[in-house]
Amino acid sequence: ERGFGDFEMRPDTKSVKILTWQSGTALVVCDYLHHDGSPVEEAPRSVLRKQLDRLGKQKIKAFMASELEFLLFDQTYSEAFDAGYQNLRPSSDYRIDYHILQPGRDESIIRTMRNELTASGIPVECSKGEWSRGQHEVNVEYAEALETADRHVIFKQAIKDIAHNGGKSASFIPKFAEEEAGNSCHIHISLQKNGKNIFWDFQKKKPSKTFQHFLGGLLKYSPELCLFYAPSINAYKRYQSGSWAPTRMAWSMDNRTVGFRIVGHGQSFRIENRMPGADANPYLAFAAMIASGLAGIEEKISCPEAYEGNAYSDESLPALPSSLEQATDLLNKSTLAKTVLGSKVVDFYVHTARLEAKAFASAVTDWERKRYFERI
């Protein structure tokens, strides 16, 4: 509203990484500051820090992980650009989930990704082929929330750089083709106090009250904070029945049709949020989860019994927003978001999303040309 001013960038020396896939290159993540030294509230890292400070006042730490999927194509980025991103060839001709042959064909470049990330201080646990053609997932070890978010953004750059160096291209677009599964970013979270997972009652050997309230907050508030899980026009095309992405709010111990899947036990007991796509900004998505969960704890929100069945076909369950416009309106009306994230933050991201929706509304798509060229 006041034009484009300058900001200061303060390097976080704890975030320094030597990028082994780039010759003689180091990377440091910075925090945005105003000239008076105060944080830029709207900056994604500031948004997450604010929620982590709330946890810190209770001596609680959030441990998180993000599972990013991406599509690998045989064309380079320049070739994909010249082709208008049409008729691209995925690195596999069929779905490769739990298949051995096709992931093996991609192993030289996937191995390079694993090795270079680990050598650069981003420790990789594993990689596997996924449900769509040319789709892969490379999982990084969990860590405290801010470290995981930093790793996340560097990870995406690494995957694209290494694909480019190998004569290919990689895309994190949430939904590349309607007949294929989308690229997700499942987020795992647990809370620890004095080194113990407070989502688990170690005496009773079952989920704790803290877990139940945190999950209750996620179920109640995630729809109105969905913009932070799905920030693009394309993201909402991922929310389709039978697509491995959720469409409704529910939780279960092991059910991939729901929004929240509960996994592990004891110290590893955690919540998996299946809403975010690979376009999610990790700082904002992590902050939204923590804000929702803390509201659940503070309000002592109860969570319902674990859902059993196919959530895709159960119309009694609350639905996720179906478009960027709907998610933007929900965020704009969210009292929780304005209270705990801040009105400036909400106004900024609502404004940004509305500009994106406006840009798309004026675009003429291939679908329109095919549907209307001759028929009307």
Which stretches of residues belong to each language-model region?
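Glycine-rich, acidic/polar active-site loops that bind/position phosphate-bearing ligands
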Residues: 1-376
